[in-house]
UniProtKB/Swiss-Prot annotation:
Enzyme Commission (EC) number: 2.7.7.7
Record key words, sorted: Cytoplasm, DNA replication, DNA-directed DNA polymerase, Exonuclease, Hydrolase, Nuclease, Nucleotidyltransferase, Transferase
Catalytic activity: DNA(n) + a 2'-deoxyribonucleoside 5'-triphosphate = DNA(n+1) + diphosphate
Pfam families, A to Z: DNA_pol3_a_NI, DNA_pol3_a_NII, DNA_pol3_alpha, DNA_pol3_finger, PHP, RNase_T
Annotated source species: Streptococcus pneumoniae serotype 4 (strain ATCC BAA-334 / TIGR4)
Stated name of the protein: DNA polymerase III PolC-type
Annotated InterPro entries: DNA_pol3_alpha_NTPase_dom, DNA_pol3_finger, DNA_PolC-like_N_II, DNA_PolC-type_N_I, DnaE2/DnaE/PolC, DnaQ, Exonuclease_RNaseT/DNA_pol3, NA-bd_OB-fold
GO biological process terms on file: DNA-templated DNA replication
Homology family: Belongs to the DNA polymerase type-C family. PolC subfamily.
Enzyme superclass (EC): transferase
Domain of life: Bacteria
Main location: cytoplasm
Location(s), subcellular: Cytoplasm
Amino acid sequence: MSNSFEILMNQLGMPAEMRQAPALAQANIERVVVHKISKVWEFHFVFSNILPIEIFLELKKGLSEEFSKTGNKAVFEIKARSQEFSNQLLQSYYREAFSEGPCASQGFKSLYQNLQVRAEGNQLFIEGSEAIDKEHFKKNHLPNLAKQLEKFGFPTFNCQVEKNDVLTQEQEEAFHAENEQIVQAANEEALRAMEQLEQMAPPPAEEKPAFDFQAKKAAAKPKLDKAEITPMIEVTTEENRLVFEGVVFDVEQKVTRTGRVLINFKMTDYTSSFSMQKWVKNEEEAQKFDLIKKNSWLRVRGNVEMNNFTRDLTMNVQDLQEVVHYERKDLMPEGERRVEFHAHTNMSTMDALPEVEEIVATAAKWGHKAVAITDHGNVQSFPHGYKAAKKAGIQLIYGMEANIVEDRVPIVYNEVEMDLSEATYVVFDVETTGLSAIYNDLIQVAASKMYKGNVIAEFDEFINPGHPLSAFTTELTGITDDHVKNAKPLEQVLQEFQEFCKDTVLVAHNATFDVGFMNANYERHDLPKISQPVIDTLEFARNLYPEYKRHGLGPLTKRFGVALEHHHMANYDAEATGRLLFIFIKEVAEKHGVTDLARLNIDLISPDSYKKARIKHATIYVKNQVGLKNIFKLVSLSNTKYFEGVPRIPRTVLDAHREGLILGSACSEGEVFDVVVSQGVDAAVEVAKYYDFIEVMPPAIYAPLIAKEQVKDMEELQTIIKSLIEVGDRLGKPVLATGNVHYIEPEEEIYREIIVRSLGQGAMINRTIGHGEHAQPAPLPKAHFRTTNEMLDEFAFLGEELARKLVIENTNALAEIFESVEVVKGDLYTPFIDKAEETVAELTYKKAFEIYGNPLPDIVDLRIEKELTSILGNGFAVIYLASQMLVQRSNERGYLVGSRGSVGSSFVATMIGITEVNPLSPHYVCGQCQYSEFITDGSYGSGFDMPHKDCPNCGHKLSKNGQDIPFETFLGFDGDKVPDIDLNFSGEDQPSAHLDVRDIFGEEYAFRAGTVGTVAAKTAYGFVKGYERDYGKFYRDAEVERLAQGAAGVKRTTGQHPGGIVVIPNYMDVYDFTPVQYPADDVTAEWQTTHFNFHDIDENVLKLDVLGHDDPTMIRKLQDLSGIDPNKIPMDDEGVMALFSGTDVLGVTPEQIGTPTGMLGIPEFGTNFVRGMVDETHPTTFAELLQLSGLSHGTDVWLGNAQDLIKQGIADLSTVIGCRDDIMVYLMHAGLEPKMAFTIMERVRKGLWLKISEEERNGYIEAMKANKVPEWYIESCGKIKYMFPKAHAAAYVMMALRVAYFKVHHPIYYYCAYFSIRAKAFDIKTMGAGLEVIKRRMEEISEKRKNNEASNVEIDLYTTLEIVNEMWERGFKFGKLDLYCSQATEFLIDGDTLIPPFVAMDGLGENVAKQLVRAREEGEFLSKTELRKRGGLSSTLVEKMDEMGILGNMPEDNQLSLFDELF
């Protein structure tokens, strides 16, 4: 046997007689694969023959036992050089194959393990009854059996089943005999039960049928109460009659074409998860299984089989029942329950799971009178917490866990005036067994005494700590037990080192650690602490070279070329630090003129040295309303002015805003904990004076410090906790037991694990322990929300009395000092604009008089009066006026502004120019004499659809307008809903419109609306798969989905609304409402955003939606090209309306352009979905186009609803429900009271029709039926989930028709504008190659799309090519890119041809395109080299241009220029 195999045999302790067996004579280890994360050692052995089974089993046992001692697992595979074997040996291995792995499935094993097998060549014959001859076993199990035997050294078998009729008959007879016994036993049991019942039951009061079918059915239903439950994680293959118990986390019902219902649901028992499916006859039967719902606990029985569709194991459920699941409860009596003062919500970035509502609800459920929230560096959970606490009737204490830093970290300690160049320095370093001067030991002190850059003496002593060094210490420092075993005693080394350092300046890299360690040891041995000057080269480097990212000893020595042979051995570190010191001294004198030691702290420390300062955690709580505003200021400052990697709060800034705040000492990252561990109780008492209370946490929270070897063991950890309590007692400050909550339930730990590990090893929390193959991240603490009794158990080591004081008494007492605060205002606070009310009223009437005359028609006058009463009475005038000012400024820059949402429901908004949608009932009006005529009977859905008519007074052609939209849909029935005015500005003009807001209201009052980005479902799925890969896990699909659900929703980043701007009233400041920050922590951003998600404060402050949109840009481009005023374009143009019914108006056939209508490229109507709707409905009026717009944007309004009604001929496009406002208008025309019509509309549009009480719904239905509203209309209401506002539809359709007007009447302008603004992808070679090439490329992409193989770019390109194809079919062409004619970003018209811009070329971006045009204006390009240099083009782009024939005969180099240079 080989040496390696012999060593393994010795290690395993294999018996001598086995080692000498002939089978092992030529044994060899071919290779060993070590899976570090899963701790699996995979051996690959080579033997001369297949091993005798007894040797195989001994080897297997030895490997298993030996490796399990170290927490590892060993598996092995065998190759046999000779594969000769007897059927007897085969039979032995055949049985062994079922002992583990995929063949251990209970169903497969029970049928197959005891069968007889034989081999003939590579065929393995298995003899058994008919029961084993199943396709399922052949397909899914026999291949696994063959693989298992191959691992034992056998050849690759093809497994065949041989049916044995005798065995089949024997099995059937045994089954029937067993079945008869079961039936007989059941009957006897039933008879005994009936006899007992007859004896117990009273005589029947009345006769009943002799046979009760329902009773029998109920009795026959299987009970699962006593069934054996199988943990889901144990099921890896198909098995029958298994019972699972778990919680449902996903449910979906599907109705098949035959009417059967499939209930797909997923359950977890927290060991793993499983997909389930339950078939039922019909929807009525499905209602009996409504117990299958999210968060319900079920016990289910069924067969686990491979689902051919999902390719995953799925249980086909036969029986199920709901079970009562034990929930953790707080078992302490009322009045003796704790208050949690340290809980994180999902707003702690990538760190914690629960929404604040869950924390509040859990505390309330457990009977806790209060709970505190303390997210990392932010307060984004405050608004939701405020509402949740009010709802739950519990006190919420508002706090955060802040990152505190020192403003100025000294370079020199104990500074004196001294010439830096004349001082003698002792540059020293210490090596220790840990970070604590109290609990760890010095093991080496080394120093270099230096003068003028030269080493004049050296000190280097090891110290025996009195115990063996840990592997971690040896691995880190290189110091072994041999180094220290004969070393001097510590006290002697300390005395000698003090003597060595006399009359010198001490120097260390990260001096606070080294000096702290030395002082603690000096003090312990009654030696004087360090009093001479100390220079910290770490801070020296940070202030001298702030541009460097890393200032550790390793990176600095590498940068300056200083030798560092053995980092973390004190003698080498000390000498390297000394070399760096003299480089720094020279540099600081030359660059900063500093030559005196005492001036280093004065002249060199940077004002932003806080950026590199060490962060310490502290918990800050809001005591009162003053404190709330101060914490808002601190959050703002830390996220803006002092942001560096994380939000930082300099100590002096905290001091300046401390009024109304309470400070806690936080976790193990807090400075009190740190100083207790590193310097002891006395030092910690001084530090703790800064805080109002001291936090101690359960040992389980601190436990990872043991794994990191920062704390020796649990006993030392308990000592540290006792020391923290002593600190509080000495100062008379309360000590509170807090839980550092990061999730609610213990089983949720895995979700946080997945989130945290997704951050990678760059995150501090994921820093690995150990080195090389043993490196792994430290475990995370058990940070679930603990009940009072659980918390008392954690602190039982303190004794009952002290534990109760920390857990219950102190937390409740501290909670009493917090006052109630108003986090979210109860009212709307709009900015002040002088005379806003008068201006809005004046502008409204001025425009109304101009259009409708003075006096106004009653219908106009009453509408204005109604609206102004609401707008002015509720303080909304400033919102209207601000929007009007923004629109006016954009109009003056030459852009139309489109409205969104319901603002078009307001006639005042129309009159002052915010929207062009006129919400009055359809009407005529004369522009000459102001004659008007209103149609109020509902006969027209839009004024644009009325026939043309001349003025009866003056003969002038009448204008037509009015979309019949009630004002109530904008501000509510009582007109007191805060208006949400959304405006679509041109994307080109949007930045200017944003600056207009600042200009109108002031920069300090205008902020972008902030958003919070959380981990999305797909991202969470990726995190789970990454965790699975990195940590050697194997999850089935259902478990991946469960874990992804648990990991989703955690804050990941912040952002800003694309157009939302929040305006703070100028008589208040932003901190009255929200903190501020930069989006995504980008401190270079032009705008600050609200810290709170803008939805949390949108009812308190004005939010303007200044959005960017392509439509206004398109209209501006078309106006520039044509000179046509877009406001003069008619809304009832016959040619435009013809687009919706065919292609004739374009001069092409449907076959030419691949669609039956002319909708391609028309906003709102050009998508495949809407084009299909157009094909089905053939709209002919503006009102019907509004219907289409509403139907296409709603949910369950078209599909399965209006579409079916139209197909069945029950209704047509004009009568189905399309927009939300239609419901109110239709019902009022039908005769319902306006209030009821409005309420019905609100219930339907929000999808609440089937969710309201049956009594309320029946009341509405009766009223509708009484007014002859048809049954189909009422049923349609019940299906709707969401509806589009009519005003929004009207604004969009008006813009769309303007664009369509140019497509019909000015096509070259239309195509130029479309490709310049809307097209997303180009292939200019194809676009210019003619129809045949274009159509062929479209077919290629279409085929890819059918197979889901098309990329997003190709999908966008297909849309472009549809328009390109149409343009060519209409007789227009594309030219080539022209180096001297093409524009940077816009297409150019040349007769009937479009010249593409440079950005249409693949790989050529907008900035380069603009640079190329600028360079072209400077003069002709004489060579390709010059084109690359002046035009900023890459060689690849120049080559592409040359291939496309754009460069003509341009030479590679400019020969004339070369000639000029020579002479």
